[in-house]
Amino acid sequence: PKELLIVGASRREHTKESWLSHLGDYPEEFCHWLDFVSCDLDNQESLMHLHDESADTTYFLSVPPERYENAIINLKEAGFLDDPDHTRVVIEKPFGYDLESANHLQSVVGRYLREKQVYRIDHYLGKDTVNNILATRFGNILLEPLWNREYISEVQIFATETLGCDGRAQYYDTAGVVRDMLQNHMLQVLS
């Protein structure tokens, strides 16, 4: 689209240039769509740097799960989520750490947003390899009739990680690898 703006926001003090260098190498024609503002989801005043009333806006909450509630409340109370036809919120898993916390977060979402404003996602399912499973299963006329319980006796899923917990230690301390990888990623791939 011609009128697209992707704004990174963080409590960390960055300039647009320092933020772009932190992201890595991207083509200039992509980078001109990027901007950066420093703000704090816990401080409504600092959120005012985010607002653009003329645009359809999606807020991707790339924050620790325990901050989702406060982020939603402050974005709503600052007036950013008032137009359900033009504002969205993306919440990445985990959506709570157990049934009680998931129900609580759902009550917050229901109180401050309309359901059509909310996207709950798992970034892992967007990976090329995972998407290729479906393409291979349903898009290959040779394999499609054979890919069923009559011809497949066993399914093995290997999740090999090349990265450690770098930058994710706090998340893993609260979520744990079983919650992060097994119950979300691996079971969704299996299904």
Residue positions per predicted region:
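Secretory/organelle targeting and membrane-embedding segments
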Residues: 1-90, 95-191
